[in-house]
A protein has these predicted regions:
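Amphipathic alpha-helical dimerization/coiled-coil segments
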Residues: 1-5, 26-27, 80-111
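N-terminal helix-turn-helix DNA-binding core of bacterial DNA-binding proteins
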Residues: 4-45, 67, 71-79
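Residues within the DNA-recognition helix of helix-turn-helix
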Residues: 52
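Short, Lys/Arg-enriched C-terminal cap helix and immediately downstream tail that follows
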Residues: 60-62, 68-69, 85-86
């Protein structure tokens, strides 16, 4: 991953509503959620949510797919993995025991 992409993704997450949207979509899993449900769940006006979804989408962190009249948004798990790997590359000067708690926490958070 290029530093520029990592900065774009981290910047997209560095706002309260966008971080909440992202976390909600991660929690929703691969089935995702329609934009309307996201707006209701987070109590965000639809026009505000639309702008936030565009920023997250442009950063590659989420994807939207039209299903009938709705757009279903999902977290881009490949992008998330890439960002985590980028952040953890060359971690701890090769001392795996330092990274073990981080990896254990990540595994326990997953389904």
């Amino acid at each position: 991953m290029e530093s520029k992409l990592a900065l774009s993704q981290l910047s997209a997450l560095a706002q309260e509503n966008r971080l909440a949207v992202f976390r909600l979509l991660v929690k929703a899993g691969p089935d995702g959620l329609p934009a309307g449900e996201i707006a209701v769940a987070l109590n965000v006006p639809p026009n505000t949510l639309s702008a936030q979804l565009n920023i997250l989408s442009n950063a590659g962190l989420i994807e939207g797919a039209r299903q009938g009249r709705s757009i279903i948004y999902t977290a881009n798990y490949d992008a998330i993995s890439g960002l985590i790997v980028f952040l953890m590359e060359d971690c701890c000067q090769g001392r795996a025991e330092v990274c073990t708690p981080i990896m254990a926490a990540a595994q326990s958070a997953c389904c």
